[in-house]
Amino acid sequence: MTSKKTILLVDDDIDLLENTSYMVKSMGHDVITAQDGLEAVLKYKDIRPNLTIMDIKMPKMDGFDAFFKMKQFDPDAKIILITAFSMDEKKHLKAKSMSLITTIHKPYSFEQLEEMVNKYA
């Protein structure tokens, strides 16, 4: 059994956020949630999670801009971006150059999520 970690989940889709939160909690980890990039950055600074899993397309601040702010605050931040859409290739390349772990596409399975959390948290 892996040790309990704190995971920050960020998505503006409430149903997906609740389902993903349930899945991560079922793995034995603590979950903190945010519904937009701005809230995510503030919570990241406050809790310093072991891993952040964040949607790209969100209101107030998108996932890329939140990623850049988190990395500016903590260059060692572990962040996975998720998307259901095509992405801004320039921002994606910049994020990869700043140690973006990976980008996964919606819908993702419990197994994919579990693998990512176990590997990177």
Protein language model features and the residues they cover:
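Active-site beta3 strand of CheY-like receiver
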Residues: 47-53
